[in-house]
């Protein structure tokens, strides 16, 4: 769990709190849920330096069918807030990668993205109809997927959120994508064919490699940390494989 100082005192953003609650609710539905120990220097990072205030707090878990369930909450200089979440499947199981990011500058949500990204060849065909059935018609400011975003499914949702109604609707989309993920994970059976497992490993490695091409992640962190620390954080905490 995130510390009380974050969830009850510092973190007052209602949208992020709603999304956090929803993600945790679905995470709790997974079998054999256990916390993962990570270097504490990378788990909770807080600075009160005037003009450079920041906190980053992470949650790491694993469960049946998932090698890593990661949630990150961050605030930079009191105006930039980020919620980042990736659920990486265990390659023995045919489960997609759940990813969600929200970027909020003051009261403006400049980026909101959620997807169930394929973690094996043709995997998306198994859930494409389910994702396409999620209503996304209310959003007015859809954003273009970057070139490195070929890792996403055809039903990746990426937009700026313009008002309270769109923020509520985004929470609903996330909820439905998570519900689909949980259903898929419940049906998944362990695979023992080494070639199939290796294919899934390669898909996750590529997912991480493509995500690391998103320069915006490092640009934010480099304002507060040196390049060595940033590279280690991205490769160890965010996109390890």
Swiss-Prot record:
Keyword Oxidoreductase: yes
Record flagged with keyword Oxidoreductase: yes
InterPro entries xref list: Ferredoxin-dep_bilin_Rdtase (IPR009249), Ferredoxin_bilin_OxRdtase (IPR022870)
Pfam families referenced in this protein's UniProt entry, alphabetically: Fe_bilin_red (PF05996)
HAMAP family: Ferredoxin_bilin_red (MF_00618)
Job of this protein: Catalyzes the four-electron reduction of biliverdin IX-alpha (2-electron reduction at both the A and D rings); the reaction proceeds via an isolatable 2-electron intermediate, 181,182-dihydrobiliverdin.
Protein family according to the UniProt entry: Belongs to the HY2 family.
Annotated protein name in UniProt: Phycocyanobilin:ferredoxin oxidoreductase
Originating gene: pcyA
């Amino acid at each position: 769990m995130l510390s009380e100082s974050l969830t009850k005192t510092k973190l007052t953003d209602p949208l992020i709190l709603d999304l956090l609650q929803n993600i945790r609710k679905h995470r709790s539905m997974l079998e054999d849920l256990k916390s993962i120990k990570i270097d504490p220097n990378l788990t909770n990072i807080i600075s009160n330096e005037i003009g450079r205030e920041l906190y980053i707090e992470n949650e790491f878990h694993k469960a049946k069918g998932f090698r890593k369930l990661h949630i990150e909450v961050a605030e930079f200089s009191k105006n930039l807030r980020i919620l980042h979440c990736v659920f990486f499947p265990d390659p023995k199981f045919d489960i997609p990668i759940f990813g969600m990011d929200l970027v909020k500058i003051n009261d403006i949500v400049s980026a909101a993205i959620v997807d169930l990204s394929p973690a094996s060849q043709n995997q998306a065909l198994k859930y494409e109809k389910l994702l396409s059935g999620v209503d996304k018609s209310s959003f007015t400011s859809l954003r273009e997927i970057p070139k490195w975003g070929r890792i996403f499914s055809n039903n990746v949702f990426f937009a700026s959120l313009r008002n309270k109604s769109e923020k509520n609707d985004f929470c609903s989309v996330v909820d439905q994508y998570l519900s689909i993920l949980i259903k898929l994970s419940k049906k998944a059976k362990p695979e023992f064919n080494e070639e199939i497992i290796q294919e899934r490993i390669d898909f996750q490695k590529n997912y991480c490699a493509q995500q690391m091409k998103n320069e915006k992640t490092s640009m934010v962190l480099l304002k507060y940390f040196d390049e060595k620390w940033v590279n280690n954080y991205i490769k160890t905490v965010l996109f390890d494989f």
